[in-house]
Amino acid sequence: MSYELVVGLEVHCQLNTNSKAFCGCSTEFGKPANTNVCPVCLALPGALPVLNRRVVEDAVKLGLATDCTVARQSILARKNYFYPDLPKGYQISQFEEPICSEGMVFVDTDEGRKNIRLVRIHIEEDAGKSIHDIGDDTFIDVNRCGVPLLEIVSYPDIRSAGEASSYLQKLRQIIKYLGISDGNMEEGSLRCDANVSVRLTGAEEYGTRTEIKNMNSFKNVEKAIEYEAKRHIDVLENGGTIFQETRLWDADRQETRSMRGKEFAHDYRYFPDPDLVPIEVDEEMLDRLKQELPELPEVRAERFVRETGIPAYDAGVLTSEREVADYFEKVVRACGDAKAASNWVMGEVLRTLKEKNIPVALFSVSPERLGGLLNLIGKGTISTTIAKQVFERMLETGDDAAAIVEKEGLAQISDTTEIETLVQDIIEANPGQVEQYRSGKTRIFGFFVGQCMKAMKGKANPVVVNEILKQKLDG
């Protein structure tokens, strides 16, 4: 029998607001335990929440960017459950009336582009943190209580672990483009739970699902889903039953393990929070936020192809991060050569960022300076080979390319008389290779080019060298 994998993802995105969702406490990470707190965080009697306007705006922006319907009125609800690091005994969330619903995210698969539908995007607050690694005691840190989250829930449209990873990466890309979160999975700014089930191929009814937690990287998301799908199939093939439960992914043992029985929505006894008025999104706010939306990656990539003529693949790489796309456009403005800018940003710049493990914001070579380097190549002042040496010197010194070229005498030699004399010397010094070339072994032409470039320490203009060599050898 063959089975079909069915996956839906619940993604929690921690917003990068300065203050919490329902009070004015700081959201700064890494502060001493229980210092970013107030009576609202601690659920002291009489403390009342006040919704952070920025949280609403970020939710609407994400909804607009994913083609959701934005509710003009939505309700904040209490999700009731006990957890030691949840002082109130409930979490402020949304249930029946979320702020955004029925959206979509496109992903590229082996079969082409696919639309993953979104059920909803809703606002909620984070819980605190239990600390178990200090002696035999457990401590509670409520600094994180009330930090704003957006939960993005997909329909069960995902059919492979690879699709799940692609969807998550595309969603993260959109979130980062909007600037509402850094989307860092390793640090918990982006968290993903996967609802996994299998069914016989061609069946319409879904199988029993399990929820997988504790996946802190794209690779772990793929591995956990693949493992859980195989576990489901093995259980069913052996006549067993899949139970609805929550399971944890153990990255060390590369397996999922049971955590608890999976709750149903009605177990949480959701009801509207009486301390918070409904969220109103009026026409003026909606129009303003639409105007504030940045150009999203797919649209930007299409524009790059249309306006600059670079290949679609290049455009996709360059728009993978908003800051890289911004850098590329500034380089193009500085040098006027989009293809050269694309090659250098995708090559030397991204290589350096990866080696140094830094974002483009901390890159020491400004786009204007890189554009200056490319101008020197375009004018024939230096060769591409020398340009790479100059680039390394720019990284080390912070100097402009032109200053480095002048100071170190790296300018390309294009003087035909000087090059012609050198070429003649090399031809006379290698009669055997000349005879091979003239007998039809033209591939040896590269040998002569190499000898010329070596003699002039890479500074000879390769175009001039090729022209003169051709004339001399064919003459």
Swiss-Prot record:
Transmembrane segments: none annotated. One of its GO terms (biological process) is translation. InterPro entries: Asn/Gln-tRNA_amidoTrfase_suB/E, Asn/Gln-tRNA_Trfase_suB/E_cat, Asn/Gln_amidotransferase, Asn/Gln_tRNA_amidoTrase-B-like, GatB, GatB_C_1, GatB_Yqey_C_2, Gln-tRNA_amidoTrfase_suB_CS. Pfam families: GatB_N (PF02934), GatB_Yqey (PF02637). One of its GO terms (molecular function) is asparaginyl-tRNA synthase (glutamine-hydrolyzing) activity. Its EC number is 6.3.5.-. It catalyses: L-glutamyl-tRNA(Gln) + L-glutamine + ATP + H2O = L-glutaminyl-tRNA(Gln) + L-glutamate + ADP + phosphate + H(+); L-aspartyl-tRNA(Asn) + L-glutamine + ATP + H2O = L-asparaginyl-tRNA(Asn) + L-glutamate + ADP + phosphate + 2 H(+). Heterotrimer of A, B and C subunits. This is Aspartyl/glutamyl-tRNA(Asn/Gln) amidotransferase subunit B. The gene is gatB.
